[in-house]
Regions:
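Basic/polar, cationic surfaces and motifs that engage anionic cell-wall
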Residues: 2-11, 18-23, 97-191, 195
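Hydrophobic "anchor" residues on beta-strands that sit immediately upstream
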Residues: 28, 88, 147
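Cell-envelope and extracellular/periplasmic
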Residues: 35, 72, 82-100, 116-120, ...
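N-terminal capping segments
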Residues: 184-227
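N-terminal catalytic cores of peptidoglycan-degrading enzymes
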Residues: 1-85
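Solvent-exposed, acidic/flexible segments
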Residues: 24, 84, 100-108, 197, ...
Length: 227
């Protein structure tokens, strides 16, 4: 499958800071806090100089507008990890300057929409948040799965900040619900037999959370009935 860029992009300023075409297919998304209430244009501007030795695939400005800094086909320099960035779409999001590096609703809503778009174009129906570094980095996603990772797992940083970190489960649930992976997947309980408890909850939890919003049935009740 060929690589494409998001149609949500309204501004493009390509950075020279990248490693060329990826050596791994896209199966991760890594959202970051840019540490500043920057515009979409300013985020790209941070990465135009080769002396910076950093970049990202997309930026989300403080008003929610999306910019393209490194084409999706190319590996950006964003997460302090070659292995992660080879397979992840990296997104720098406008945020406050200090912990918890909060993001406004326009930025968060755009992040949800951008993740939905990235998953759709890359053939994914489920976005997973496992919430644990070792489990995530050792997890082999199914062909229709995308996994969230964070910069703090690869460097001594707070990124993406505690504000977004606490909402990554919600991000995964919203994206998975929009992708419709739950009702059409035909998932059976037996498909979870080789997963740890944390992996099983991460895989099916967002599906039942999304179902709760439409049916009113508590997610824990639906999950218990499923298992």
């Amino acid at each position: 499958m060929g690589y494409t860029n998001s149609p949500l992009v309204v501004y493009t300023k390509l950075s020279p800071n990248h490693s060329g075409q990826r050596t791994h297919s896209i199966d991760r998304i890594t959202p970051h806090c840019v540490v500043g209430q920057l515009s979409a244009e300013s985020i790209c501007g941070c990465f135009t100089s080769t002396s910076r030795q950093a970049s990202c695939n997309y930026g989300i400005g403080t008003d929610g507008r999306v910019s393209l800094c490194v084409e999706e086909k190319n590996r950006s320099w964003c997460s302090s990890s070659n292995a992660n960035d080879q397979r992840a779409v990296t997104i720098e999001c406008a945020s406050d300057m200090n912990e918890p590096y909060a993001m406004n609703s326009a930025v968060y809503d755009s992040l949800v929409k951008l993740c939905i778009d990235i998953c759709k174009r890359n053939g994914k129906k489920n976005l997973l948040w496992l919430g644990d570094k070792n489990k995530t980095l050792n997890y082999a996603p199914a062909a229709d799965e995308m996994v969230l990772t964070v910069h703090r797992w690869f460097a001594n940083k707070s990124c993406p900040g505690n504000w977004l970190y606490a909402r990554l489960g919600d991000l995964a649930a919203r994206v998975t619900a929009a992708l419709g992976g739950s009702s059409s997947s035909g998932m059976q309980a037996s498909s979870l037999k080789n997963l740890s408890e944390a992996e099983a909850v991460a895989k099916i939890g967002p599906l039942f959370t999304a179902n709760q919003k439409t049916t009113g049935i508590l997610a824990c009740v639906s999950m218990a009935q499923f298992i």
